[in-house]
């Protein structure tokens, strides 16, 4: 792991849980493939329901927010519509960013990592979005999320814009 994290040596695809070929199948030209998506509009998906996932900022790492459009039909595709990172925001600032996204999208579900300091962001978001879901991470919860992502990626049921390289 030292070589991967600090020496810029890549993990062998055979040793990775997410295979490169599977990940590449999830990459689409969102501007043309997603007919209901207008990225530069005030409301890029109009009234299409979306979910927000939020990992609050701790001390020096960035906070991360994703907007996901769940499938409209059984067995359909989950689309990662938007992703943002924030740095240097206090709890109020982080909650305001989430509220901004609630104005931009038809948000029907928000899940926040409320482990540790994330509790404060969760409490603030709950004031304007009472249905917010609190996630308290454990080894079991993380394993469950990775396995679900593996399943979606292996079956090409997750998509994101091919212009994203991070």
Each language-model region and where it sits:
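Short, flexible loop/turn elements at secondary-structure junctions
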Residues: 10, 27, 56-58, 87, ...
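Intrinsically disordered or highly flexible coil/loop and linker segments, enriched in small
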Residues: 2, 12-16, 62, 104-108, ...
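A general structural signal for short secondary-structure junctions and capping/turn motifs
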Residues: 41-44, 56-57, 101-102, 150
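ATPase catalytic-site recognition across NTP-hydrolyzing enzymes
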Residues: 1-54
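Gly/Thr-rich phosphate-binding beta-strand-loop-beta motif of the actin/hexokinase/Hsp70
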Residues: 43-71
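Mg2+-dependent endonuclease catalytic cores in nucleic-acid-processing enzymes, primarily RNase H-like
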Residues: 72-166
